[in-house]
């Protein structure tokens, strides 16, 4: 495996891509909900070993300029789990080495989680959610191609697009409310 990426050298097993919307300020409860589903133990329980994991923010950055902020393959734990190949194969793998790699992966992903979820109270001037979605699906730089037999795109967003060409907010607001660029009245 590539030491910095934890990925197998000659195969692509699967790819889970997390696209997280930071265009509206998030409340602490929303941050907790997001982190509880896309980081830490949740990754180990829901994503098989050696599947690639990538994270990208939806924010004020131009879609073509946005970078994938973290991309690594999930290291195996060495313990038995629901996933085939998770347990150390004593015939050809060293258990201590597997544990060391998993600990390195866990440390890097924990450090990244803190960086990624910082500044969750900022507000963007636009929300080009669908452009980001198309970018991930179409652009080779995302490495979200059919070369992976299993692909999953996870979008953490209210899916409320707003930009110059198209805005959901203009369809759900009165003229007086249009002064608030990314707020929509309650649907209750």
Language model features: what each stretch is:
Residues 33-42, 135-138, 180-187:
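N-terminal post-signal-peptidase region of extra-cytosolic proteins
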Residues 160-188:
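VWA/integrin I-like adhesion module and closely mimicked acidic/polar interface patches used
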Residues 1-9, 12-148, 152-155, 161:
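Von Willebrand factor
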Residues 10-12, 147-148:
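Short basic/glycine-enriched coil/helix segment immediately N-terminal to the Walker B
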Residues 146-155, 165:
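Mid-length scaffold segments of soluble, non-membrane domains
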Residues 5-8, 72-74, 91-93, 171-173, ...:
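Sequence contexts marking disulfide-bonded cysteines in secreted/extracellular proteins
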